[in-house]
Amino acid sequence: MRPLSVAWLLLAAAGLAEAQYPAPTQGDVTLRDFRFTSGATLPELGIHYRTLGTPQRDAQGVVRNAVLITHGTGGSGAQFIRQDFAGELFGPGQLLDAARYYIILPDGIGHGQSSKPSDGLRTRFPRYGYRDMVEAQYRLLTEGLGVNHLRLVMGTSMGGMHTWAWGQLYPDFMDALMPLASLPSQISARNRVWRRVVIDAIRHDPEWEDGNYTTQPQSLRTAQEMLFLVGSNPVLRQREMPTLAQADSVLDASLARSMRTGDANDILYAVEASADYDPGPGLEKIKAPLFAVNSADDLVNPPELGILEREITRLPRGRAVVIPLSDATRGHGSHTVASLWKQYLRQLLEESER
């Protein structure tokens, strides 16, 4: 056999060894006459989704194996189809084995392949908040997929905040909740400030033209730079780019990728959506067991504030952990590295098993 053929076979075998989970099925659901909390309506709101596995119903017709996983700001359900996440959770014998669970990965309003400003409405697209996004997820499940119960709700970053909201808005709909990289409190202080930097950069940019630009405004670059910064782990970044030239090179490469696909209106809407997030007053409404996971190197949710540790005591069935800084953590992005926290997911699933 030729050396090239041997090398190709070895690479293919390595790929198969990693990709043990099945490929997702993709689809779209149209939600009719969607009313936003602002009072605005859309006659049709499209929600894109990915699923793995098959729903299983009990004798009463209740779906018992559905798992909803929601993504962060600027992301989509596609971000979970990667080795660090799906490869750790969705494969045979793993915690969320797709042969056992029905895994649902939606693209939120304004994200991915779901309806968003850049589809054509631009700033005529209704302003949306996290409550609207959760409502759309609920309607996707109940109207589009026929899911009337969730075994687990989990989410990362913005999706983590959605998880807290799910527990309050639909407290009897799920068996367990796992918010990652989020806090059960209103967006404030530094977390609000970096968002304001993004919002102000776009809204005060003459090139934005009230959202009616024909080419992306330069403020999109500022927004992408801020998103790059707040998602960073300082120790990892120092190791990755220890010189001025290397820092510029890594940032420029990241910007080149994000500027090709990003849209200023989409990012503006997504960042502004967090303004209605305020789970604090209603935490006691959460009934299901909840295990919150943050990381010590998260610039968005700094552990030194003590918010998570304080607020989790208000939940009779709530627990929380902050993963220590290590060579394996990835700052705010630790939420998608399942090897860091899957032991806590195991505990939650065992605790909440019927």
Task: List each language-model region with its residue ranges.
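Alpha/beta-hydrolase-fold enzymes
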Residues: 173-257
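Catalytic active-site module of serine/aspartate enzymes centered on a nucleophile-bearing elbow/loop
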Residues: 317-354
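Conserved alpha/beta-hydrolase "acid-adjacent" motif
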Residues: 299-306
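N-terminal cap/lid subdomain of alpha/beta-hydrolase-fold enzymes
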Residues: 50-119
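Active-site nucleophile elbow and catalytic-triad environment of alpha/beta-hydrolase enzymes
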Residues: 266-282
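Short beta-strand/loop motif that positions the catalytic acidic residue
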Residues: 286, 292-294
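Conserved acidic catalytic loop of the alpha/beta-hydrolase fold
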Residues: 131-151
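Conserved hydrolase catalytic core segment
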Residues: 148-188
